Amino acid sequence: MAVTIQQEPQFFTSASNPVIYTFESDETTQANFSYIVELYIDGALHSTHQVFPQSAEVAKFNASEAVRSTLASPLITNFSLTTNYDTAISTIYIIVSEKYGTPPAIQLDATSNATFVFNGALRHPDWLDFSWKDYNVSTTNILTPGVLFLTSWPRTRKAFCGLNERMFLGFISNDTSFDVRFQLFDSIGNLIVSDNVGLTFNDLTVVDCSPVTIMTNTTITAGNFAAAAYYKVRVRGTGVGIFNGSSEEFIIYIDNECHRYETRRLHWLNKFGVWDSFTFTLVSTDSTKVSSTGYNRESGVWDGTSYTYPLYQGQATTYAKTAKDTLILNSDWINEEVQKWLVRELYE
């Protein structure tokens, strides 16, 4: 007489992909048998579900639809150096109970481990290949140093950010604390300045890597950025684990080029639920299309006992207007890897 949970999601997993639990019982032959699944999100009971065996005595439960409706990834506009992105990640677990008998009654139960579900939506092949340890900044992670930030930017190409532009990098961590390091270099690779900022534990953190934000929140100055050609961003777990705990060193080149046209910096949610950015440097076109919705009423009006057709009385009546804004963005020449990245991010 027991429930056994056989399969659970990865410790960190994406909300818009299957979040699957499987479980079985040795009491499935009992009358009126079913499983009762209680889903807990951030420690509170979210919903209760009745599930029936699907493959012999085994059943499954997908928490994706329930948990993804609770998540959001708002654009960060407050110039904080780091943001605890708790709106974009939740901790979930389930309690599975047996229910059977005449009348059916709740019997024994089993509780799953906790899972961190972030506001991601991976393409199916990416989801099948996803391993949370490739992104976990933690001293308990044997894959450190070098784990990845939550972006698919092609690492063989240069990422650019202007002095007055915004750029964000996100990471997951199950460590107890970590720090963020910024290093500025000149055009021949000489270190100009370095600064570390220590932070307490967050499950999902977004670093605002914008030059203005860095200058506001660290000892790095405008003069340092004026002398720099690029800078590196690295985060490192500083907990009690035995491994290095460091992420990759993400290199950002400072875009000081004079552009003929007004540039447009586009920000969008990537597949991990974190903001990616790209600057379009050629001429952009804004347009607005106005659409009207209306009806034709019967012509003519009554004038006493006569029905007349005055010039002032129209037939076409508009009751609503809508405007659709369109922005056509044009890039300068870009590398094929970057072009493919943009197509995958924005169109597919």
Where are these regions (language model features)?
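Extracellular/virion structural assembly segments
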Residues: 2-4, 16, 172, 191-204, ...
